[in-house]
Swiss-Prot record:
Cofactor: Mg(2+); Mn(2+)
Cofactor note: Binds 1 Mg(2+) or Mn(2+) ion per subunit. Mn(2+) is the most effective divalent cation in vitro, but the enzyme can also use Mg(2+), Co(2+), Zn(2+) and Ni(2+), with lower efficiency.
InterPro entries the record matches: IsoCit/isopropylmalate_DH_CS, Isocitrate_DH_NADP_dimer_prok, IsoPropMal-DH-like_dom
Site, as annotated: Critical for catalysis: Y161, K231
A Pfam family annotated for this UniProt entry: Iso_dh
Protein name: Isocitrate dehydrogenase [NADP] 1
Binding locations of D-threo-isocitrate: S114, N116, R120, R130, R154
Quaternary data: Homodimer.
Biophysicochemical property: temperature dependence: Optimum temperature is 55 degrees Celsius. Maintains 90% of its maximum activity after incubation for 10 min at 50 degrees Celsius.
GO biological process: glyoxylate cycle; tricarboxylic acid cycle
């Protein structure tokens, strides 16, 4: 179908989705991309060049990606008369199934709190999937970063990120406080006359669809455990319910059984016959254990706020969010993204590390079934880092490293695909 501002390439075809949510990927799929704000202008072109090189090398012209630019954020506001998230963009992201985006800024002033959060909610991208791994040679503040190798499944649609809150002193806040006191008998609001109020929605459906994705990932990748991370010791009916619903889903959907009387459970991987342990950990204890015993964890399922903290804490252990990939996924739609911010003071300087977006594109290639191209991206990144040809964030911490710009780092990755 024709669009108002977006030009659909003549070559290429759409990715389609089967009834079982598997993908039909043509040899020349059209992939929408959002350049992103700030440093998006630097890192997105590098990502495209690296991906194109990997695909060309892997398939010798038999496959290629046909890129289609769509708009969100500051660039969209200029093209769509002030709209930061045009309806047209949302329609395209739904229709073309798989897309990738750079970092987005949040409009200053009232209204939309975060474009990233709004995008997830509008498209019901209820999973934020964040793989965390260390590449040899990357500077790390921990003693054995190679022990950290896990995938975070963060619930994207609920928890306090739903944005249901009222400003202290507002009429709406006063109404909610009055209702809580007079209708619900709440007596624990310490300073109720000048208090902001927020709601933390956590549902059975939202919790279980996330845990189902996490367990399926463990099955598909033959991983030994899924850990439910929560604060159920304090918030029993939200975080605690998440834990209970997770265990319930494991039993009912995957046949998990109690381990040594519970609450931990065990199940057989139906593809390999290996054991998968379903366990839970309190969030604050987990933040200690990822420093002290990271090798004990492989797949993590958690609610929105905990997932935000945990993802970035883990990224710091393996080199920072500059090389931390991520994807937001729903039933059939996936938007891969740079996990860092827009860093506007560096925009246009060809300076920052494009690794986060490149590794997110590697996730995209792997999910498309283009494993050979994905492997080449990994080989290129490994080679560039091992050779100490890196961007400034790594160069300043690596003795005898060679400082590269964003675009030069992309060229180094492509060069090391041949290694």
């Amino acid at each position: 179908m024709p669009y108002d501002k977006v030009i659909v390439p003549r070559d290429g075809a759409k990715i389609t989705v089967n009834a079982d949510l598997s993908l039909n990927v043509p040899n020349h799929p059209i992939i929408p991309f959002i350049e992103g704000d700030g440093i998006g202008v630097d890192i997105t072109p590098v990502m495209i060049k690296v991906v194109d090189a990997a695909v060309a090398k892997a398939y010798q012209g038999k496959k290629s990606i046909v890129w289609m630019e769509v708009y969100c954020g500051e660039k969209a506001s200029k093209i769509y008369d002030g709209e930061y998230m045009p309806t047209e963009t949302l329609e395209i992201l739904r229709e073309y199934v798989i897309s990738i985006k750079g970092p987005l800024t949040t409009p200053v002033g009232g209204g939309m709190r975060s474009l990233n959060v709004a995008l997830r909610q509008e498209l019901d991208l209820y999973v934020c999937q964040r793989p965390v791994r260390w590449f040899e040679g990357v500077p790390s503040p921990v003693h054995s970063p190679e022990l950290t190798d896990m995938v975070i499944f963060r619930e994207n649609s609920e928890d306090i990120y739903a944005g249901i809150e009222w400003k202290a002193g507002s009429d709406d806040a006063k109404k909610v406080i009055k209702f809580l006191k007079e209708e619900m008998g709440v007596t624990k609001i310490r300073f109720s006359d000048d208090c902001g109020i927020g709601i933390k929605p956590v549902s059975k459906e939202g919790s279980q669809r996330l845990v189902r994705k996490a367990i399926q990932h463990a099955i598909d990748n033959d991983l030994p455990s899924v850990t439910l991370v929560h604060k159920g010791n304090i918030m029993k009916f939200t975080e605690g319910a998440f834990k209970e619903w997770g265990y319930e889903l494991a039993a009912e959907r995957f046949g998990a059984e109690l381990l040594d009387g519970g609450p931990w459970m065990t199940m057989k991987n139906p593809k390999t016959g290996n054991d998968i342990i379903i366990k839970d950990v309190i969030a604050d204890a987990f933040l200690q254990q990822i420093l002290m015993r990271p090798a004990e964890y492989s797949v993590v399922a958690t609610l929105n706020l905990n997932g935000d903290y945990i993802s970035d804490a883990l990224a710091a252990e393996v080199g920072g969010i500059g090389i931390a990939p991520g994807a937001n996924k729903g039933g059939s739609i996936a938007v891969y993204e740079a996990t860092h911010g827009t860093a506007p003071k560096y925009a246009g300087q060809d300076k920052v590390n494009p690794g986060s977006l490149i590794l997110s594109a590697e996730m995209m290639l792997r999910d498309m079934g283009w494993i050979e191209a994905a492997d080449l991206v990994i080989a290129g990144i490994k080679g560039a880092i091992k050779n100490k040809t890196v961007t400034y964030d790594f160069e300043r911490l690596m003795p005898d490293a060679i400082l590269l710009s964003s675009s030069e780092f992309g060229k180094a990755i492509i060069k090391h695909m041949d290694a």
